[in-house]
Amino acid sequence: DPGHTSYFDHHRGRRQRCKIRMRNYVDAHLCFAEIKLKGKRGQTEKRRIACPVDQYGVLGERAQSQIRSAYRDLYARDLTQALEPICWMRYRRTTLVAKEGGERMTIDRGMVFMDASGTCRIDDDLVIVETKSGNANGIADKILRRLHQHPTNSASKYCVSLAALRQVSKYNKLLPALRKLAVVPTHATPTA
């Protein structure tokens, strides 16, 4: 939404927050609208709604209705914000999956963040690695720690993109991630 409610809820660490996005899987010719909700005990719940590929970027009436319903089901209140696109991003993703245990790791590179005012390109040599294991102590987590690649807490690509595109001026919690990606905004001094 234009007020960046999702960003500020994330930045403030609100327990009940959501993020809405559309995903276009180019190679698979698939498109989804997704809502990610923080549920009980901090667990993330994700709901996906299949959308026509040729309507990528347009959150249709059916998808909006299902998103609002998912929000209402979990939080027992209505999602009142306008659902409008405020940024776009492109990247190439590699996903590695363990043969046993369900551990996954995603590696995103070639990131480009865009909005109506401009574009921010991340150096192609820089990547975002995300590990997905039950207790953050999987094989990939251990290897990354041995290589002194420690996680940056609560740094979603969505939040990083808004700070990098200068849509928000409060981004102190994101500074470690922004520095690693060499995209610290220079327009103003960050505030808490």
Segments predicted by a language model, with ranges:
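Phosphate-end processing signature that detects enzymes handling 5′-triphosphorylated RNA
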Residues: 1-192
